Curated annotation (Swiss-Prot):
Transmembrane segments: none annotated. This is O-acetyl-ADP-ribose deacetylase 1. It catalyses: 3''-O-acetyl-ADP-D-ribose + H2O = ADP-D-ribose + acetate + H(+); 2''-O-acetyl-ADP-D-ribose + H2O = ADP-D-ribose + acetate + H(+). Belongs to the MacroD-type family. YmdB subfamily. Keywords: Hydrolase. The lineage of its organism: Bacteria, Pseudomonadati, Pseudomonadota, Gammaproteobacteria, Enterobacterales. PANTHER family: GANGLIOSIDE INDUCED DIFFERENTIATION ASSOCIATED PROTEIN 2-RELATED, MACRO DOMAIN-CONTAINING PROTEIN. The gene is ymdB1.
Length: 171
C-alpha cells in the first residue's frame, strides 16, 4: 500500500532511500534545509555537486539533480531548485510543480521506494505555504499513483504551520 506520511522534524534525521534538498541553483549549499543537508551529509555531497556544476553549470529553477547522501540516513540526495515567490505572476506555480515533478522523474529512474521532501520554496524563497502545499500534494498524489516502485513519500515539515497545513489538506 503506497502512502504519504507527514512528519514534523529535521529531514536530515529521517531515514529514507532519498532525501530531497531544496537547493539553490549554484548547488553549493546555503541556508535553511540546503545548509542542514550539506552539513549533516558531509563534504562528499558538495564534491558531487561541484562535479555537476562543472558538467552543466548548476541546476535551473524547476530542475533536479541527484548525488550520493554522504553521512545522511539515505542513499541519495535529490537537489531541486524551487522558485522564489514574487507576486504569483511569474510562473511560480508552474515552476514549483516542475521542481516536484523533476524529483519524481529521478525517483522513478533510480527505482527509489521511499523519498522524503521538505517544504520546497516556503522558507526564505517566500512561497505562500498553503499554495505550495496544495501544489506539492497534487503532484505527489499523481506521481505516487503512476510510479511502479515508489512505496512511501515523507513530507518532513520543519515548522508546525506546514505540518498542520499538510495534515489538514490530506484529511
Amino acid at each position: 500500500m503506497k502512502k504519504i506520511t507527514v512528519i514534523q522534524g529535521d529531514i536530515t534525521k529521517v531515514s529514507a532511500e532519498a532525501i530531497v534538498n531544496a537547493a539553490n541553483s549554484s548547488l553549493l549549499g546555503g541556508g535553511g534545509v540546503d545548509g542542514a543537508i550539506h552539513r549533516a551529509g558531509g563534504p562528499v555531497i558538495l564534491a558531487e555537486c561541484q562535479l555537476i556544476r562543472n558538467r552543466q553549470g548548476g541546476c535551473k529553477v524547476g530542475d533536479a539533480v541527484i548525488t550520493g547522501a554522504g553521512n545522511l540516513p539515505a542513499d541519495y540526495v535529490i537537489h531541486t531548485v524551487g522558485p522564489r515567490w514574487s507576486d504569483g505572476r511569474h510562473d511560480e506555480d508552474a515552476l514549483l510543480k516542475r521542481a516536484y515533478q523533476s524529483c519524481f522523474k529521478l525517483v522513478d529512474y533510480h527505482g527509489i521506494k521511499t523519498v522524503s521532501f521538505p517544504n520546497i520554496s516556503t522558507g526564505i524563497y517566500g512561497f505562500p505555504k498553503e499554495r505550495a502545499a496544495t501544489i506539492a500534494l497534487d503532484v505527489i498524489k499523481h506521481c505516487i499513483a503512476e510510479n511502479r516502485t515508489l512505496e512511501n513519500v515523507n513530507l518532513v515539515c520543519f515548522d508546525a504551520e506546514n505540518y498542520d497545513l499538510y495534515l489538514k489538506l490530506l484529511n
